[in-house]
Structures are given as C-alpha cells and as structure tokens.
Amino acid sequence: MERRGMKVLSMIQPWAALLVQGETLYETRSWKTRYRGPLAIHASRKVDKQACKYEPIRSLLAKNGYTEQNLPTGVILATCELTNCYQVIDADDTSAILDCGEVVTGDDFLLGDYSPGYFAWEIAGFRLLKPYIPVKGKLGLWEYPIGEELMVGSTEIIH
C-alpha cells in the first residue's frame, strides 16, 4: 500500500505562530513554489527573540497568549491550504505590490520580507492541531506521513 504524505513548511518562531493565528495573509520566501494544496506548518526549534520584542509583533503575540518564552517549537502546529504564490514586483518602506496587482500594507507588510523578487505564498483555511505533532523540521517543502493526527477530526478550525 502506498503511503501518502502531506507537504510541510518549517518556519522560525514567532513567524509560524503569527501566520497560523491569522495575523498575516502571506508567508514570504526568496523562492517560489508551483505546489498548491494541503500544507502543514511546522515551528522550528529556533525562536527569533529580537523579533518577539519588536512592535507590533510583541502585541500580536500577546493577543494570542504568546511570549517569546512559551512559543511552541519543534512541532507541526496546523494544517492549511497553499492557494497561490505571487512575486513581489515593487516595494517601499510601507507597502509592496504583488504581480497579481494586490498591494500589501499594514501588519501583512510588517510581518514579511517583501523585497522585490521575493514571493508571497497565499495560505488559508488553518486548522490548529490538538495536540501538536513533535517532529524535526527540514529546509524547503518536505513530506510528513499522513496519520490520524493530521485528520480533520483532530483539529480545530481557527480561521
């Protein structure tokens, strides 16, 4: 029997928590992907402690009950859908323009790297896993075997 897997993206905290909690619509990367479909979000063991002290990040984390000390690490946090991947075509200090014509501003802009040439991955439909799945992360998109813990019944829809 063929074993199916789910694509997983590892992210440093606090970025993983902010994405999963719906504080930003996009995850920015220096590379594009043609993949569209189910995706799991993995919080790596690393925490960017400086970013956690920066406003508005500190307040957004606090709104969701997090501090730099209690962010979950080394776990798959949630599943979602990777719906699109847009290239950043222009940016200044407060906004960016994506190749789809969308203008990114506010917290979405502050929570990503919108350097021209980078890519904004549009991700939606988050389901928080209960409990989180402890696993070592990897670079790029990687596969995790689908098991009961990734089934819809063991998740809570958060946005």
Predicted regions and their residues:
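Structured alpha/beta reader/binder surfaces that contact nucleic acids or chromatin modification marks
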Residues: E2-H159
